[in-house]
C-alpha cells in the first residue's frame, strides 16, 4: 500500500479504503462497479484478493470509526456490506500486510518480506542441490537402501 496516507493507514489513524467503502455504502454503492459481486460468489474472492483482505476480522485492530460507532451504540456486524439506513458499524480493517500470519498465501507481501524470502531461497539452494546430487549418486551406484529393498529387480 504505497503513496500518501499509507503510513496513517498502517497506524490505524486513517483507513483510506475503509473511508471510501463506507462512503460508497452510504451512497448505496451506486458508483462502485463491483458492488453486486462484493458480498457473495466468485466476485467476493476477487474483491478480497485485489484489496489484500485475507485475514479474519478478529486478527486486526479496530479502526477509530468502528470504536466511535460502537461507543455510540451501533452493533458491529461480521459482514462488510449493509443495507442503507441501518446503524451498523463496519468490521475492523484487516491489515494482512502488517501482520503476515500466512506468509505464503499473502497476495502482496512487503518488499522487505519478499527480499527475505529471496535470501532464504538462495541460501537453501546449494543444500538442496547437494542432497539431490547425493541421492542421484547413490541411485546410480546401486547402494541406495531404496533400490536394494525393491523385491522385483
UniProtKB/Swiss-Prot annotation:
Superkingdom classification of source: Eukaryota
Annotated region described as Disordered, given as residue ranges: 19-46
Protein name, entry field: Uncharacterized protein FLJ76381
Species of origin: Homo sapiens (Human)
